[in-house]
């Protein structure tokens, strides 16, 4: 139900989503605006048939100004897409060809305070490192963890599991879909309840 717009210049935001159509159809509906930055990474992690479990670290590069902009508000979020050279090694319960996870502005500020962003020697941009982990046990699910420069989980860095209901994220949000982000952001702002009452 949101309209997506792409800012004309490199402002640190890739996509702005607005509920303009819903406001026209329901004049009493509160306006919603969400801003997204999208980053991608590639990995070749896979789980060997005779050796269950896997782990890989992926890195995303952001300008200091991008982090500052995103960390200002919960209605801004960083979406990280990880593509894999190895077919099906990162598929979730819905056979997705890649893993995607998000961190909203509040969580970005929290992990930043915990040392999540660091600058490598000779690089102008900040590095955000995330580990993709698959437990060794039979029923384990892939999950993403934000880590510091030494590879240790930062406060708030556990994002829950992909395609599973157990072991939720530290904030109990679904960090692996756009729908999960919108649901979480709206529940925190109280917009969801207002929108439901207007569309009934």
Language model region names:
Residues 1-11, 17-200:
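Mixed-charge (Asp/Glu-Lys/Arg
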């Amino acid at each position: 139900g949101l309209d997506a717009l792409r800012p004309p210049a490199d402002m640190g935001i890739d996509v702005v989503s607005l509920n303009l159509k819903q406001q026209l159809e329901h004049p009493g509906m509160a306006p919603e605006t969400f801003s997204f930055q999208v980053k991608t990474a590639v990995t070749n992690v896979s789980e060997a048939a005779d050796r269950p479990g896997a782990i890989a670290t992926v890195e995303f590069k952001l300008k200091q100004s991008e982090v500052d902009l995103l960390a200002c508000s919960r209605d801004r979020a960083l979406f990280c897409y990880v593509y894999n050279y190895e077919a099906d090694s990162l598929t979730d319960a819905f056979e997705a060809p890649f893993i995607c996870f998000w961190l909203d502005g509040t969580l970005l500020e929290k992990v930043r305070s915990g040392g999540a962003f660091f600058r490598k020697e000779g690089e102008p941009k900040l590095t955000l490192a995330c580990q993709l982990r698959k437990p060794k046990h039979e029923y384990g699910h892939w999950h993403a963890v934000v880590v510091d420069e030494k590879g240790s989980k930062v406060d708030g860095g556990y994002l829950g599991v992909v395609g599973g209901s157990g072991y939720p994220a530290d904030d109990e949000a679904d960090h692996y879909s756009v729908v999960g982000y919108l649901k979480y952001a709206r529940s925190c702002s109280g917009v969801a309840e207002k929108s439901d009452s207007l569309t009934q």
